[in-house]
């Protein structure tokens, strides 16, 4: 079945490449709607309003006043609560006479239990607006709190992605939510995605709906100057893979099924010509600035550029989606044993999200290049590879080698073995990947359980 799907997709791509190249017909995604079709014919872009600028956080009190907010929930984590980003938010709220309550119990890499704790706080508070100050964990938790407090009769699994949850469409009105990201990675301020660990299954899953997108994202690059080295690196790897995966994802008009109602069109729709622009631009910024941002905390140009790149990639993948690196990362993070990442002040073992994503990237892109080799070569070139004499059939190996060098230069752990996994863990890792259909089905190349096992095995060592 997987082989048959690959053959069909490969044939369609060949037809696209051979089609007329005049300006009127050269768009490889152009396709008219066909009544009753099984594959998609449309895509849509949904992003938050974004405001960028140094010290722009000082405007948040005025924003909440303009929204008519009288009782605001501010969410953050215990590492941030005494630091300047949260202080800047609270000072602005006080200055503008906005009443608020502070919730600082967000868990880094949230779980269903930590989500439910925040949801209970939100339900009791009867808030009319939300503010999330932190990384993706904080902003995602804030999205969930807003959703379930606005739909108090819903069961927790109602809105969770299938097959773990029911994946119901969000039809209730939500309260305004302003996101203030303090890391340069998740792009959560731009997306309708909230990710968490479902502890019963030791699997990562999430909620995906345009309805939970933040109303406004305040992109204040000053907040990145205090990020520790490994947090900068791992956050940047998330941007890297968001860009690569969305650019190489299954094209939107090859995705099925086509929804019978636009409300059922998924947030992750497949690569498309608008997301492509954002993904490639973000990738260029990563190539130019990530190493500088990691190595020199005083390099304001690099740190500020990476903060924007996170949002750029968020616009891209928030509509196109991601695929195998992310799908495989969820069990890597969820089955963590004793590994504790440097520069993360947490009370539990942790493989940071960006690290769990990037460790499989050489193996994944070596595997997926068969279906869209030109895009893989283009990505390798952006990351510094010389492709002038490259052959199409070498695309996967070239991108994989380019990624390995990039990761080696940034002192990334030597594969899954370095974060505590052995080949004996592969069956559990594969099992944890299988429920991630929301993202894995966007891989440009179909895959079997055996092939997933092979990718995990190939990722045990990188160098």
UniProtKB/Swiss-Prot annotation:
<dbReference type="InterPro" id="IPR039697">
    <property type="entry name" value="Alcohol_dehydrogenase_Fe"/>
</dbReference>
<keyword id="KW-0496">Mitochondrion</keyword>
<dbReference type="InterPro" id="IPR056798">
    <property type="entry name" value="ADH_Fe_C"/>
</dbReference>
<keyword id="KW-0809">Transit peptide</keyword>
<comment type="function">
    <text>Catalyzes the cofactor-independent reversible oxidation of gamma-hydroxybutyrate (GHB) to succinic semialdehyde (SSA) coupled to reduction of 2-ketoglutarate (2-KG) to D-2-hydroxyglutarate (D-2-HG). L-3-hydroxybutyrate (L-3-OHB) is also a substrate for HOT when using 2-KG as hydrogen acceptor, resulting in the formation of D-2-HG.</text>
</comment>
<dbReference type="GO" id="GO:0004022">
    <property type="term" value="F:alcohol dehydrogenase (NAD+) activity"/>
</dbReference>
<dbReference type="InterPro" id="IPR001670">
    <property type="entry name" value="ADH_Fe/GldA"/>
</dbReference>
<dbReference type="GO" id="GO:0019552">
    <property type="term" value="P:glutamate catabolic process via 2-hydroxyglutarate"/>
</dbReference>
<keyword id="KW-0560">Oxidoreductase</keyword>
<dbReference type="InterPro" id="IPR042157">
    <property type="entry name" value="HOT"/>
</dbReference>
<dbReference type="Pfam" id="PF25137">
    <property type="entry name" value="ADH_Fe_C"/>
</dbReference>
<protein>
    <recommendedName>
        <fullName>Hydroxyacid-oxoacid transhydrogenase, mitochondrial</fullName>
        <ecNumber>1.1.99.24</ecNumber>
    </recommendedName>
</protein>
<dbReference type="GO" id="GO:0005739">
    <property type="term" value="C:mitochondrion"/>
</dbReference>
<dbReference type="GO" id="GO:0046872">
    <property type="term" value="F:metal ion binding"/>
</dbReference>
<dbReference type="Pfam" id="PF00465">
    <property type="entry name" value="Fe-ADH"/>
</dbReference>
<dbReference type="GO" id="GO:0006629">
    <property type="term" value="P:lipid metabolic process"/>
</dbReference>
<keyword id="KW-0443">Lipid metabolism</keyword>
<dbReference type="GO" id="GO:0047988">
    <property type="term" value="F:hydroxyacid-oxoacid transhydrogenase activity"/>
</dbReference>
<comment type="similarity">
    <text>Belongs to the iron-containing alcohol dehydrogenase family. Hydroxyacid-oxoacid transhydrogenase subfamily.</text>
</comment>
